[in-house]
């Protein structure tokens, strides 16, 4: 989803750069990792597993989404600030008992404690504060025609089934499981050579049965 989300990230940054005098902007990176906001986390088998996954996401964020935002935003001449990754905030939130971070997505929304902290100040309208999470990488597109489906249709025209089955095996580290990831990997290898070890693993949501990291592919996801 990092590559998918980079497109929306880049276009929003481009619009800001072309239509305002802003040079430094805030973004929401880190909130899902620190505050347990990803939809799949509601399937954590116990509070301990939820806490462990949150800490892992925070530890590895510089490999994925933060790097994506930095490149997408700075390429448009802007500087990003990530308040949810403030060291004091991260340290404090990770110290909160995991039992208080559990959510079901219905009676208790993801990032409940973060939402509740702003509930009595009037800083945010309720329709923004209490709306359901909308996955960014697919949230740039309609539910009838998701962004990841658009990309996959494009890739199908570029990569044949035979090529995918035959050539993906040359990548021993993080072997591509989908044509889309194989397409990205080919571009990466052309630009950066054999440096795939820089990424420790291919990110996928835990505790769910899916081959695609898109939140819209998860059972129970609603926007």
Locate the predicted segments by residue:
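Soluble or luminal CAZymes and related metallo-dependent hydrolases
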Residues: 4-8, 109-110, 180
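Mid-to-C-terminal catalytic subdomains of enzymes
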Residues: 22-52, 60-177, 199, 203
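ATP-dependent adenylation/nucleotidyltransferase module used to activate substrates
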Residues: 2-33
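Acidic, carboxylate-rich catalytic segments that either coordinate divalent cations
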Residues: 157-223
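Internal alpha/beta domain cores that form substrate/cofactor-binding pockets in large enzymes
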Residues: 57
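Proline-centered flexible-loop/turn and helix-kink motifs
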Residues: 18-21, 98, 193-194
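Active-site phosphate/pyrophosphate- and oxyanion-stabilizing loops and adjacent acidic/basic residues
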Residues: 10, 14, 116, 186
């Amino acid at each position: 989803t990092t590559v998918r989300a980079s497109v929306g990230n880049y276009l929003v940054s481009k619009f800001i750069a072309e239509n305002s005098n802003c040079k430094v902007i805030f973004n929401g990176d880190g909130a899902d990792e620190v505050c347990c906001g990803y939809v799949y986390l509601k399937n954590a088998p116990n509070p301990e597993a939820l806490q462990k996954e949150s800490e892992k996401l925070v530890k590895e964020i510089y490999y994925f989404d933060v790097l994506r935002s930095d490149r997408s935003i700075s390429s448009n001449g802007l500087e990003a600030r990530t308040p949810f990754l403030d060291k004091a905030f991260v340290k404090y939130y990770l110290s909160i008992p995991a039992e208080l971070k559990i959510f079901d997505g219905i009676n208790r929304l993801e990032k409940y404690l973060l939402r509740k902290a702003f509930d009595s100040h009037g800083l945010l309208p309720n329709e923004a504060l209490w709306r359901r999470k909308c996955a960014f990488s697919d949230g740039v597109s309609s539910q009838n025609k998701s962004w990841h489906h658009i990309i996959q249709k494009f890739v199908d025209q570029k990569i044949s089934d035979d090529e995918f089955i035959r050539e993906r095996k040359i990548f021993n580290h993080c072997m591509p499981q989908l044509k889309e990831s194989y397409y990205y990997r080919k571009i990466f290898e052309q630009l950066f050579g054999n440096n795939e070890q820089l990424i420790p693993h291919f990110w996928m949501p835990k505790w769910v049965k899916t081959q695609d990291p898109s939140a819209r592919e998860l059972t129970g996801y609603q926007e």
